[in-house]
A protein has these predicted regions:
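Universal eukaryotic N-terminal targeting presequences
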Residues: 1-4, 8, 14-19
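Mature extracellular/extracytoplasmic regions of secreted and cell-surface glycoproteins
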Residues: 15-208
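Cleavable C-terminal sorting propeptides in eukaryotic secreted/cell-surface proteins
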Residues: 5-7, 210-222
């Protein structure tokens, strides 16, 4: 009860940085109200939420179908035959929803949205999980992505050395600038959120260190 009263007071005085409605800021720091920049991958470990798509992006981009079209514009698509192996991961974005399972997982498509993700499942490549910040305490509408570069299936899809930083940077390189898919043209800009999460490997899945940075993308439909 005491914690709830404290939270209510902070909200009333605007001290949490977490208004209740969308369209105010691009995202809210998950840690402000008890969230984390690591998702829950099991065994007390997590993977970094190392890319954020701004809640001030074009609204269509932030929908499930709009995100998929944008993902295909930058080289990702649905999993092979829409089959997901393994348990979903969850994230707490500090929005009052607690730990929520990933919305979707998308994989590098190697130039073919229909079959390329099957190749990624075999030989490895880039992929990301999506979490939406939309709870009543911090409803930015932003999409938090856990991006990583993984090994082939013969290595159990483990993350490659430095795979969180490398996966993030590869996605951003593909996204920034003008991209087009299905007749929709996007312009994406990027900003580095330096030191937004702890540096190092403490609590990080596979014991792979991260540099502490996330990339903040704003995506506009032209």
């Amino acid at each position: 009860m005491f914690a709830q009263l404290c939270t209510a007071a902070l909200l009333a005085f605007g001290l949490t940085g977490a208004p209740r409605r969308q369209g105010i800021v691009g995202f809210y720091d998950p840690t402000t109200l008890g969230g984390s920049w690591l998702d829950n991958a099991g065994d007390g470990l997590g993977e970094p939420l190392n890319v954020v798509i701004s809640g001030l992006s074009s609204p269509q981009v932030l929908t499930d179908t709009g995100l998929l079209n944008y993902a295909e514009a930058i080289g990702f698509a649905n999993e092979c035959f829409d089959i997901h192996l393994g348990n979903p991961q969850s994230a707490n974005l500090g929005d009052g929803n607690g730990w929520v399972n990933q919305t979707v997982e998308l994989r590098q498509d190697y130039g073919s949205p229909d079959l390329g993700t099957c190749l990624e499942s075999l030989i490895g490549g880039n992929h990301f999980r999506v979490y939406r910040q939309n709870g009543a305490l911090a409803n930015s509408g932003a999409l938090f992505l856990a991006v990583s570069q993984e090994e082939p299936v013969t290595d159990n899809h483990d993350i490659i050395p430095n795979g969180y930083n490398l996966g993030r940077d590869a996605l951003v390189q593909a996204a920034v600038g003008v991209t087009t898919h299905n007749g929709v043209s996007y312009t994406t800009t990027a900003e580095t959120l330096v030191g937004i999460m702890p540096v190092g490997s403490t609590g990080v899945n596979h014991g792979i260190a991260v540099d502490g940075n996330a990339i903040f993308l704003t995506v506009r439909i032209n």
